[in-house]
Structures are given as structure tokens and as C-alpha cells.
């Protein structure tokens, strides 16, 4: 083997390995969330969260769901939403804010910020698939529920892409074991197909309690199927 081949071979092998690696393994560390994740871990150290419960994870719409325990009485819930995050951020931190809790069910809301930051619907679908693959590596039988990307006034111009992402994720999840797509879109739109302003805060993006009431109503029967009936 000549010298050029010998020196080029490691580069080729590295390139092939990079292609073979799952998407979640090649993402750079999302350092902007270091403080949030450290705060979660400090809280876990002070008081261990319930095992085998229902883990809510995703962006600020999860983070601001401060009434989780009241909305699902008797259900061991954990809130690990961190504001502004995209799907890939949750994927990167699975080993720190998912796996340690051994949840029976994971409820994810994310994808909204992804599209707002320029991701295509196709990329959102791929990122969610990568999240599922990463979770399955540690928790092969956990049930994963995806809450559809919600319509909002602030991001109304992006709604076609969000709707496309919803449809693609729903289609991909359909018929697969331990996966469930929960679509509450219609309840959040008015008769003209516009986002219902009364469900949203002044920023036109985040939800008021009335919006969370819609999510709660949509999720209660789903969680009951998984053995988490509310009291």
C-alpha cells in the first residue's frame, strides 16, 4: 500500500463512521442549556423524583406547565421542560433528564422552536425520530407520546410548516408499538381556522391555563390507557 493510501485511509474510515453514527450521537453539546440541566440534577439530588412515572419534556410550553400535578392528580409526574429548546436539545440530554427516571411514559412537546429557528418540517420529523431512537437505546419499551405542535398568533406565518411536521410525525408514529400522537389542533383553532387568542398569553405564543386545559383533556384518556388514571 502506498503512502497516499495509508494516510487517506483513516480519513475515509472516520467519514464512514460518522455516516453510520446515529444523528443524536453527532450533535454538538447545546451549551446554552448547561445551567438548566444542572438545576434539574441539583433538584433531583435534593429530592429524588418518582420512578416509573410520566415524564413531560420539551420546550417552554412544558416548562410553563406548572399545574401538572393538579391537572393529573394521583399521577407521578415530572416536568423537565426547558425554555427555547428544540427537539435535538432534549435528545442530547436523554442520559441526564430522561433515563435516570425510568419513566413508564414520556410526553414530549417540541418542534415549535425548531421551525421558528429555520428548520424544515422534514428536519423536525427526522429530529423526533432521532429522539425516539436515543430514548429506545436506554428504555426500549417506554411509551412515548408526542403532543402536536400548537397553532399560535405569534407564529401564524409558520403554521403551514408546523402542520406539515405534525402530519409527518403522526404518519411515522402510526402503527408503531409504544408510540402515540396526540392531535389537539382543532380545539385550538376558531371557526375560521385561526389560533384562538383567548388561549394565549400576551406574547401570542405561550398558553394560558385555558390552553393547558385542552392539553389535559386530550392526555387524560391516553394516560389512563397506560395505567395512570387521575383520581
Descriptions of predicted regions:
Residues 42-54, 93-99, 133-136:
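Short amphipathic alpha-helices and their capping/turn segments at secondary-structure boundaries
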Residues 139-143:
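A short helix->loop->beta-strand "cap" motif at the edges of active sites that frequently abuts
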Residues 121-131, 161-166:
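Charged helix-capping and loop-helix junction motifs
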Residues 1-56, 62, 66, 70-71, ...:
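N-terminal secretory targeting modules
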Residues 69, 98, 132, 136, ...:
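N-terminal cationic-hydrophobic initiation segments that often serve targeting/anchoring roles
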Residues 62-78, 87-125, 145, 149-153:
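Oxyanion-hole/transition-state-stabilizing segment in secreted/luminal serine hydrolases
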Residues 56, 77-79, 181:
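Conserved beta-strand scaffold positions in the cores of enzyme catalytic domains, especially
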Residues 17, 153-231:
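Catalytic His-Asp segment of secreted/periplasmic serine-dependent ester chemistry enzymes
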